[in-house]
Amino acid sequence: MARATPLNRYRNIGISAHIDAGKTTTTERILFYTGVSHKIGETHEGSATMDWMEQEQERGITITSAATTCFWSGMGQQFPQHRINIIDTPGHVDFTIEVERSMRVLDGACMVYCAVGGVQPQSETVWRQANKYKVPRLAFVNKMDRVGADFYRVKEQVKTRLGGNPVAMVIPIGKEDDFEGVIDLITMKAIYWDVESLGMKFEEREIPEELQEKAEEYRSELVEVAAEANEDLMNKYLEGEELTEDEIHAAIRQRTINNEIIPMYCGTAFKNKGVQKMLDAVIQYMPAPQDVPAIKGILDDKAETEGTREASDDAPFAALAFKIMNDKFVGNLTFVRVYSGVIKQGESVYNPVKMKRERIGRIVQMHADSQQELDEIRAGDIAALVGMKDVGTGDTLCDEKEIITLERMEFPEPVISLAVEPKTKADQEKMSIALGRLAKEDPSFRVHTDEESGQTIISGMGELHLEILVDRMKREFKVEANIGAPQVAYRETIRGTVEQEGKFVRQTGGRGKFGHVWLKLEPLDLDSGVDYQFEEQVVGGVVPKEYHGAVDKGIQERMKNGILAGYPIVGVKATLYDGSYHDVDSDELSFKMAGSIAFKKGFMNANPVLLEPVMKVEVETPEEYMGDIMGDLNRRRGMVQGMDDLPGGTKQIRAEVPLAEMFGYATNVRSMSQGRATYSMEFQKYAETPKSVAEEIMKKFSGKDDDEE
């Protein structure tokens, strides 16, 4: 079967934006104009096609990056038909993982900005991720019909806040209620969209007189940018010759794909103006799969050589699984981006990460919530595979004879944990199935059982992230659960060395109990990774060998439950060196108790301390909020380790802060910086808890022990 659309007419793009920039409405209009969607869905009525999970419809924010395929031949049918695969990305900072995941498989991105709000914090986060994966981008300034809309201010912010190089391709005709259309700076014509046909039709007119001068000023800026593409154009420009429209298009395309410039468009998706022109730009300036560098990977040889896969049907098959979803009708869906080669339904692929072969069942192309069956997928395609058994997010699927492992995605460590408990016994099993499925879909969500409390602990990227996962558990899996408060895992250890006696004697009628030991306790280096060591140096059999294991067991059981404040004890070496026994009354239990008693007393005499987890925190913030953020980190017992300058006037602060002080930080950092600062944190080390804090924790725990001598 031949390829339906030539590869050079493919565009794999993402639409990315801050929460309220109107990205979903923009995507809806794209689907409408490209003929996929016949009735326009509105986010604020909760019916947008791309937002197909129930909570997204309720909250009006996009959570899952759904992949959709559509076709476009230009506003005036001036191009051959192009295939556009759109990946919708979420705009909330807790879903950064989704954005990162989609950036990884895109060839280009369209950044949507609100004409009133401009460049906002999530825009900065998304921008950094697009930089990381070197994704070419264009910008669309939406909501030009709103009070306070200002295209030129947003253009300036892209330059100053993001360090981008924006180039206006159109300028607006009017603004707010008077926004009527745009001026195309290449053709120098005014474009007005027809209201009756919901913007399907348009007409070109002469530029309004009052905008002629402004249009000429911005056109000369555009031509100069185009002339910088190569020497021939530069010479032509410097000699005062006019560049042709074709030359300008080719130059802007080249510079956009090289990540040198950001073409900017504007409009109002809600009023059906401007999105059509931006779609033309996707075809004109966004890269086809073969315009971006070939994907790199590691070949399956001894030396682990780096290899590449060219975007071509003739190259060996290689694809990346970038999202796993559960569909209520077909079950497990694995979204893949095919980089090279062809695969047909029923054929097998190899997963080098799991070292397994899997057979491809059905292949479906997704349109938001409906799907079309395919017989095969080829280089450049984005589609979903049904029924893959053991494929995780970020895994490679490739030809078994030509094995390559594509660069894996990096997933951040979760920063917040909560305990969840099923409300009834019946919910218990459903809950573990639900959590398992959700963790498979979302690599930034982890589940484990706390050994100390037996509770199920879920961890994720933020409070909203966990809230939505708990919500999905309720809706999709019908599991009712109680949620606990966020917790910190403290530890206990000793700083000094002691020798301590432990005696356990019971004398009741008949056989008694007798165990007697001397232990030496000393601290171990916490960085060594060894939490406990037991040695025996008993001379002359004063404690018979068969009881040594019991002493060790008594110590370990005592360590598990802590002594100072009920937290596990780490970093202790115990040496059994002396003691005594009784022929009749001694047994294993007696020596287990004696070991436990000696350890408890010795621990309290060996300068015991409480340890707390310390996190490595990185905050990226515009300079004007730096003072507030530094002051706040100091109040949280943070130690600032260093600072760096980032492009666009952003500062990066690196600090070490105790986890106990970081709860609620996401909300604080947003309010201190009007939402413009972002942060990440990961576990760094365990460190001694200051005395005042430790006393507070110990006060809550009053250890009641019934050991007797």
Curated annotation (Swiss-Prot):
Major site of localization recorded for this protein: cytoplasm
Alphabetic keyword roster: Cytoplasm, Elongation factor, GTP-binding, Nucleotide-binding, Protein biosynthesis
SMART domains with a match to the protein in the record: EFG_C, EFG_IV
Subcellular location as annotated: Cytoplasm
One Pfam family recorded for the sequence: GTP_EFTU_D2
Gene3D superfamilies: 3.30.230.10, 3.30.70.240, Elongation Factor G (Translational Gtpase), domain 3, P-loop containing nucleotide triphosphate hydrolases, Translation factors
GO MF term set: GTP binding; GTPase activity; guanosine tetraphosphate binding; translation elongation factor activity
Domain tr-type G, residue spans: 8-290
Superkingdom, taxonomy of origin: Bacteria
PROSITE patterns found in the cross-reference section: G_TR_1, G_TR_2
Intrachain S-S bonds: none
Nucleus keyword on record: no
Cross-referenced CDD domains: EF-G (cd01886), EFG_III (cd16262), EFG_mtEFG1_IV (cd01434), EFG_mtEFG_C (cd03713), EFG_mtEFG_II (cd04088)
Coiled coil: none
GO terms for cellular component: cytoplasm
Binding site for GTP: 17-24, 88-92, 142-145
GO BP field: ribosome disassembly
Function: Catalyzes the GTP-dependent ribosomal translocation step during translation elongation. During this step, the ribosome changes from the pre-translocational (PRE) to the post-translocational (POST) state as the newly formed A-site-bound peptidyl-tRNA and P-site-bound deacylated tRNA move to the P and E sites, respectively. Catalyzes the coordinated movement of the two tRNA molecules, the mRNA and conformational changes in the ribosome.
Family designation: Belongs to the TRAFAC class translation factor GTPase superfamily. Classic translation factor GTPase family. EF-G/EF-2 subfamily.
PANTHER family: RIBOSOME-RELEASING FACTOR 2, MITOCHONDRIAL (PTHR43261:SF1), TRANSLATION ELONGATION FACTOR G-RELATED (PTHR43261)
Protein's name according to its UniProt entry: Elongation factor G
Taxonomic path: Bacteria, Pseudomonadati, Pseudomonadota, Gammaproteobacteria, Moraxellales
Gene: fusA
